[in-house]
Amino acid sequence: MGKRPNFGGMGMGNMQGLIKQAKKMQQQMEAEQANLATQEFVGKAADDMVVATFSGDRKLKDLKINKEAIDPDDPDMLQDLVIDAVNKGIKAVDDATQASMGKYTKGLM
């Protein structure tokens, strides 16, 4: 009987172990994503004149606008405040996602 090829010391037992480890990591990542989706993240502009609340899956859940931020003569100011609050909320979600998921992707890039 011929000799089996050597794949750098990676026998079938090692391959099965790697597959098992990858499945476990996938389950952990899915649990982290589900946990993030249940959390809320807030972006605020101009001393809470506009507050945007996002879920962890980046969906806008609430947008509060203080009546003092509404100036009929300056709609651009309100637009800028909304954009600022929304961008800050999205950044909060992204930062939390990176902190949570980064441990799984470190070294893969």
Curated annotation (Swiss-Prot):
SUPFAM superfamilies: YbaB-like. Keywords: Cytoplasm, DNA-binding. Gene3D superfamilies: Nucleoid-associated protein YbaB-like domain. One of its GO terms (cellular component) is cytosol. It is found in: Cytoplasm, Nucleoid. GO terms for molecular function: DNA binding. Coiled coil: none annotated. Homodimer. Belongs to the YbaB/EbfC family. Binds to DNA and alters its conformation. May be involved in regulation of gene expression, nucleoid organization and DNA protection. This is Nucleoid-associated protein LJ_0424. It comes from Lactobacillus johnsonii (strain CNCM I-12250 / La1 / NCC 533).
